[in-house]
UniProtKB/Swiss-Prot annotation:
Gene giving rise to this polypeptide: infA2
S1-like domain sequence ranges: 1-73
Assembly behavior: Component of the 30S ribosomal translation pre-initiation complex which assembles on the 30S ribosome in the order IF-2 and IF-3, IF-1 and N-formylmethionyl-tRNA(fMet); mRNA recruitment can occur at any time during PIC assembly.
Organism: Streptomyces avermitilis (strain ATCC 31267 / DSM 46492 / JCM 5070 / NBRC 14893 / NCIMB 12804 / NRRL 8165 / MA-4680)
NCBIfam families noted in UniProt: infA (TIGR00008)
Protein name: Translation initiation factor IF-1 2
UniProt-recorded Gene Ontology molecular function terms: ribosome binding; rRNA binding; translation initiation factor activity
Keywords noted in UniProt: Cytoplasm, Initiation factor, Protein biosynthesis, RNA-binding, rRNA-binding
InterPro entries: NA-bd_OB-fold, RNA-binding_domain_S1_IF1, S1_domain, TIF_IF1
Keyword match Heme: no
Functional description taken from the UniProt entry: One of the essential components for the initiation of protein synthesis. Stabilizes the binding of IF-2 and IF-3 on the 30S subunit to which N-formylmethionyl-tRNA(fMet) subsequently binds. Helps modulate mRNA selection, yielding the 30S pre-initiation complex (PIC). Upon addition of the 50S ribosomal subunit IF-1, IF-2 and IF-3 are released leaving the mature 70S translation initiation complex.
Subcellular location(s) per record: Cytoplasm
Pfam families: eIF-1a
PANTHER family for this protein: TRANSLATION INITIATION FACTOR IF-1, CHLOROPLASTIC
Length: 74
């Protein structure tokens, strides 16, 4: 999904919607991260709701924050 090779891509589920397009995402391994939506999702008006499965990019230096880059169809 990404051109940057320094990120970790992991699947998760949205468990909480916060303000300013921020979400709490529970990853497959049970950890919870704070994630914001990427520019392409924002530009194309893709809605992210509770219980949606998403793909999150995590930077290697801070594994508590991430960016939602893809929403899977349910």
């Amino acid at each position: 999904m990404t051109k940057n090779k320094n990120v970790i891509e992991v699947e998760g589920k949205v468990v909480e919607c916060l303000r300013s397009a921020m979400f709490t995402v529970e990853l497959e391994n049970g950890h919870q991260v704070l994630a914001h939506i990427s520019g392409k999702i924002r530009k194309n008006y893709i809605k992210i709701m509770l219980e949606d499965r998403v793909l999150v990019e995590l930077p290697p230096y801070d594994l508590t924050r991430g960016r939602i880059v893809f929403r899977y169809r349910n």
